[in-house]
UniProtKB/Swiss-Prot annotation:
GO terms for cellular component: plasma membrane. Coiled coil: none annotated. Required for the insertion and/or proper folding and/or complex formation of integral membrane proteins into the membrane. Involved in integration of membrane proteins that insert both dependently and independently of the Sec translocase complex, as well as at least some lipoproteins. Aids folding of multispanning membrane proteins. This is Membrane protein insertase YidC.
Length: 618
């Protein structure tokens, strides 16, 4: 570093020190600045003190308001939690004096996976609160201790008393041999104590639906929050995702539904201003859904008219639910909790499948045998349509050599219309309809689908064993893997595997019967047809073994039927019969689909010629 550089740095340092000394604030400025910051701190302290005072005042006001509201039932604000049980031969209900609510529901005749009676909910699984109103605000029943009075084995009154002459009663009564429990709210001596202008009570109801069955995935798929519009149809929230809905219409009932069991809350005077929510629970949590509902219903604070409601804690059994409407003018239609398919298929299941199933079950047969017999009966019913479909395919097959000749005659793409017209003419000459097998197939489809929809909802199959399957209502884990396979799970269902194999065989025989030829598009179609059963293996592996068993034997019967029909059909004789029809003058007259198709083809040909002539003139 040279002398000039050192001198420059020293001068810069002197300038910086001098500037700092000259620019420093005076003592008066320092004092003024200190007073400024002190004033800010004082203001902040005052604001914090005011905020704390305001919050304390609000909290105190809230407590005073709640205390003023609760002062009507001051004696009920303190107590000790106690439980009361009522029961009949089907269900056991435990009531909690804290809130006067239903604490648990146990079904005596249905066992869980632990071989103990099914408990729909217990303790903190569920909650229920009623908001009544006086001049000071809301009275929440969850904050009060009720007194159990007038108790019998099947009924009890939970009483919330202001004094000996003024109280609100929750009256619970179990009907004999029934899963239905009457629930009545009645005010006595509450004139002037409750807001006379408020003729409603607000209700909050929630329940975490337990996983009762072995298969979380399938049970979760059939568990949803369902509700019925007054005098109208039934609706539900999504079963596959979190869902919420505000319902402006009046409702008859709200149901928290599992696959085979439901908790239903019914209001004779209807629910209104309803909001329903459903949230998914994680697999392995022991629960499948978290349901909640907020609604209002009629309440007479004078006590002249009671609030009539009901609870149903029981199975989703079609005839059990249907019987609840017996003698009622306005039907609840709780049997809609049992899903039986689309309207036509539901009608078939309602009037035919269920009655035949019950008749077969009445013989004391194994449920596997009942399903086998039911499937055979269905196959017998649809056999005429099956035979007609087969014969239509057989006729098409024996005429295929003649169709091949027409294909060779018109190899060019521009001759496709002529080729199609000649093919249809050939079919018409032999009295064969290319659509002849479609209508019979469509007619038998609803019948076959009816049983497919019925089996998963049939609680009768629950915990019924057959062969290696210990429960026909859930999957049969013939092989269990120590890991999870995407789209398949951690197990392999043997009935599902058998169903897949028989479907591949059925596809093979069907493709042979149709004899689709070697066209590229037909080859691709063949692969698609073979791929479908393999896809079903992944889709249906979690489905009930009873359903896969039905699908397996149904397809197996179809394969056997196809083989028998193929071996008993003399195709040479069939061709001879078709040749005889060709010589019949009556067959020369084209009718039906063939005639309409030929007319359309001629019309298209004429339009094509007209367009060509116009272009030539130009």
């Amino acid at each position: 570093m040279d002398k000039n550089t050192i001198t420059g740095l020293v001068l810069i340092g002197i300038l910086l020190v001098g500037f700092s000394f000259l620019s420093r604030p005076s003592e008066e400025q320092i004092a003024a600045q200190k007073r400024y910051y002190d004033s800010i701190a004082v203001v902040q302290q005052q604001e914090e003190a005011l905020r704390a005072k305001t919050e304390a005042a609000l909290a105190n006001e809230k407590e005073e308001t709640a205390a003023d509201s609760a002062s009507l039932f001051f004696n009920a604000t303190k107590g000790k939690e106690a439980f009361t049980t009522i029961q009949n031969n089907l269900v056991e209900i435990t009531l909690d004096n804290k809130g006067g609510r239903v604490y648990s529901a146990l079904l005596k005749n249905y066992m869980g996976q632990d071989k103990k009676p099914v408990v729909l909910f217990n303790g903190s699984d569920a909650s229920m609160n009623f908001n009544f109103y006086n001049k000071k605000g809301a009275l929440q029943t969850k904050d009060f201790y009720f007194e159990a009075v007038n108790k019998t084995d099947s009924s009890v009154t939970m009483r919330l008393a202001a004094d000996s002459a003024s109280y609100i009663d929750f009256i619970y009564t179990l009907k004999p041999d029934n899963y239905l429990m009457s629930f009545v709210i009645k005010a006595t001596g509450m004139d002037g104590k409750l807001a006379a202008s408020t003729n409603y009570v607000d209700i909050s109801w929630s329940q975490r639906a337990r996983q009762i069955e072995k298969g979380y995935t399938y049970e979760n798929r059939l568990a949803d929050l369902t509700y019925k519009y007054t005098g109208d149809d039934v609706d539900n929230l999504s079963a596959s995702k979190d869902d919420e809905k505000s319902v402006s219409e009046r409702l008859d009932w709200i149901a928290f539904k599992n696959q085979f069991f439901s908790s239903v809350f019914i209001a004779e005077q209807d629910f209104e201003k309803t909001t329903v929510k459903s949230k998914m629970e994680k697999q392995g949590s022991g629960y499948i859904k978290d349901y909640s509902a907020e609604m209002s219903t009629f309440f007479d604070p004078t006590g002249k008219q009671p609030t009539d409601m009901y609870f149903y804690f029981g199975p989703n059994h079609y005839k059990t639910l249907t019987a609840l409407d017996k003698g009622r003018e306005e039907k609840w239609e709780l049997n809609n909790l049992v899903y039986l398919g689309w309207p036509l298929i539901r009608w078939i299941n309602k009037w035919i499948t269920i009655n035949v199933f019950d008749w077969l079950s009445g013989w004391g047969l194994s449920m596997g045998i009942v399903l086998l017999l039911l499937t055979i009966m269905v196959k017998i019913v649809v056999f005429p349509a099956t035979w007609k479909t087969y014969m239509s395919s057989a006729k098409m097959r024996v005429l295929k050599p003649k169709i091949d000749e027409i294909n060779k005659k018109y190899p060019k793409q521009e001759d496709a219309m002529k080729k199609q017209q000649e093919v249809m003419g050939l079919y018409s000459q032999y009295g064969v309809s290319p659509m002849g097998g479609c209508l019979p197939m469509l007619l038998q489809f609803p019948i076959l689908m009816a049983l497919f929809m019925f089996v998963p909802s049939a609680i009768e199959l629950r915990q019924q064993s057959f062969l290696w399957a210990d429960d026909l209502s859930t999957y049969d884990a013939f092989i269990t893997f120590p890991f999870h396979i995407p789209f398949l799970g951690n197990h392999l269902s043997l009935f599902c595997l058998l169903m897949t194999v028989t479907n591949i065989l059925n596809t093979k025989y069907t493709m042979q019967q149709q004899d689709t030829g070697a066209q590229p598009q037909m080859a691709a179609m063949k692969w698609m047809m073979y791929l479908m059963p393999i896809m079903f293996l992944f889709v249906l592996n979690d489905y009930p073994s009873g359903l896969n068993y039905y699908y397996f034997i149904s397809t197996l019967i179809s394969v056997v039927t196809m083989i028998i029909l193929r071996r008993t059909t003399d195709e040479n004789k069939l061709l001879t019969e078709l040749e005889a029809k060709k010589k019949d003058p009556k067959q020369m007259k084209k009718t039906g689909f063939a005639a309409r198709l030929e007319a359309m083809q001629k019309q298209q040909e004429q339009l094509a010629k007209e367009r060509a002539n116009k272009q030539n003139k130009k």
